[in-house]
Amino acid sequence: MFYTIMLERFLEYIAVEKRYSPNTLISYRKDLQDFSLFLLETEAHQDLVKVDKKIIRNFMVHLGEKKIAKRSINRKLSSLRSFYLFLLKVGDIKSSPLENIQSLKFYAEKQIPFSEEEMAHQQLEINKPLKKSLLKELIIETLYQTGIRRAELVNLLLENVDFSKGEIKVIGKGNKARIIPISKKLSSVMAEYLLIRKPLEADKEYFFINAKGKKLNDKFVYSAVNTYLSLVTSKKKKSPHILRHSFATHVLEYGAEISKVKMIMGHSSLASTQVYTSANIEQLKKVFNSAHPRAKKNVDL
């Protein structure tokens, strides 16, 4: 079976029928092309029908030997599962070599949110914005004040920023749109940024534009966040996702309803949001020690 043709049919299917985002399509294409190259190098063919469980396991070993993270290996397996389910659906194969192939087990590193004190050091000076640094500082504030994902920030459209209503519309996973409120302070700085924003014609629809007039990429956002947060914290993890994590943790600590936070975060299930309720155990200890009668009086049991 011709691999390239079936790959394109599959990508068209998940784009049209499943309405997967462009970023998701890029990930699927990369994962499946990696497997295609592996087949060619180790089996001297790209026949999907001839792929069996042994080849899949060899692919996993190959990725492990290249020091690919377990999370990334599992993602590639997930892409292959979806691909073969599609081939089953259209009747091109009778069974999937991924059946009974287990994902790798791993312990995810605990995400530690930034404290309010750390974030207080990283605030925009509205009265004295520096032209060169305003974009990068605005990126950080937008991520922290809205909780949006890096890809959602990069793909934010100019027309989806409503200054009159104080809200933005972002397109999340599965091309699902959601409305997120923005503070007057953030709105003011975003409006100020528009005064120095000079996009190229091809990228004028995007809100965030780099100095060359082009749409931002993920690498630029990650670099901006890492550089600026290095000035205020010694934490090892300084990624855009940590700012999203910090947003959720802080608004929940201040009493926001978890169901409302779920909507803002764009989570499909409440379980994803509940992760953030246990993020700051020290805060819970402080509440207990200051509020519980026995903790306050240090009564022996």
Question: Residue locations for each model-derived region?
Answer:
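Conserved catalytic core of the tyrosine transesterase superfamily
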Residues: 1-301
